[in-house]
């Protein structure tokens, strides 16, 4: 059975990170990837990589709509190895740190944390203000991993 990994891509710059993660997981084999791209993430994918969301989705095994809160990845019963959010906007990081599951990325991240699975976020912001740092601390205390690029 393949290991399931969720990849969220948000509106922060650095779409290449998410694309490369999908490429590497596909090349390695043994992984079932579930991709969720926010609307702002889709814009950045287009601006930074010159491709549409659908073209990126071809690298994933499953693509879920950002507004599909009923998707399987929004349930703790859907077993995964964890989730990576790359790039992760400060908005998404704040939503996760405060339990605000208003879309499928933040909801899936909430589920990953409550099920004690790995959540890795790749924040793309500099410099950081105090709210950013506090949200990163909160997410780390909840079991998340902050992985700056």
Model-derived segments and spans:
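A cross-family phosphate/adenosyl-ligand binding-site feature
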Residues: 1-120, 126-149
């Amino acid at each position: 059975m393949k290991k399931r990994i969720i990849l969220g891509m948000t509106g922060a710059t650095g779409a290449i990170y998410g694309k490369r993660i999908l490429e590497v997981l596909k090349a390695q084999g043994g992984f079932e990837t579930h991709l969720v791209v926010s609307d702002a993430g889709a814009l950045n994918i287009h601006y930074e990589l010159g491709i549409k969301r659908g073209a990126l989705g071809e690298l994933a095994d499953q693509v879920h709509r950002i507004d599909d809160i009923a998707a399987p990845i929004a349930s703790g019963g859907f077993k995964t190895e964890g989730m990576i959010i790359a790039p992760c906007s400060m908005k998404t990081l704040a939503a996760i740190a405060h339990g605000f599951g208003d879309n499928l990325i933040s909801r899936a991240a909430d589920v990953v944390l409550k099920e004690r699975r790995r959540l890795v976020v790749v924040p793309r912001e500099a410099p950081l203000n105090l709210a950013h740092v506090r949200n990163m601390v909160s997410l780390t205390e909840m079991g998340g991993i902050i992985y700056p690029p």
